[in-house]
Amino acid sequence: MSKGFANPRETWDARFSSDEYIFGTEPNVWLAQHADLFKPGMRVLAVADGEGRNSVWMAQQGLQVDAFDISPVGIAKAKKLAEQQGVQVNFSIHGVEDYPWTTGDYDAVVAIFIQFADPDTRATLFKRMKSALKPDGVILLQGYTPKQLEYKTGGPPNLSHLYTEELLQDAFGDLDVSELTSYEQVLTEGTQHHGQSALIGLVARRPFGCNFQ
């Protein structure tokens, strides 16, 4: 699904090839600010988890975490981070197209800066994320808005890959959207998300009785 790159696996392997964790080892701020959404024992899916900073943090909160990424190099670093922190995460090497998506299995699906997907593949991905939720399960998502093209402090250079409130409302309006906000903040998430940033955050819950299959 990473149509922004000719060979996404090779691209991300190259980016993750240094010893440095390029997005840092601390969790994404939007995710950490919503820690109260999570209860120990909840089953959570981390989409395109990269080097593991977010999945490892969720495991530290007592969650049962499945996490995948297209990059074997990224997953190897994620496993190392989990071992260092003394937590268990079920990591697997998959892109979003070949991941074995299931229906109604997760209390939460977390998607942080997954803006490698073009509009068509993004629509499919969002549908799969919704279908993966249990009733009353929650999606937590963060991305960049078009204004990020001015800051150039992270994220894709493609306007079509960026999010607006209208885009996310259209994609997730069949959920109960409790938060959908565009804002600016200085990020210090490694070397790749660093500096003034134009952000958007979403929290949306699957209503009982809704069927996204």
Predicted feature locations:
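Conserved SAM-binding strand-loop segment of SAM-dependent methyltransferases
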Residues: Q85-E97
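Conserved beta-strand signature within the Rossmann-like core of class I S-adenosyl-L-methionine
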Residues: D136-Y144
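Short alpha-helix
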Residues: S160-T181
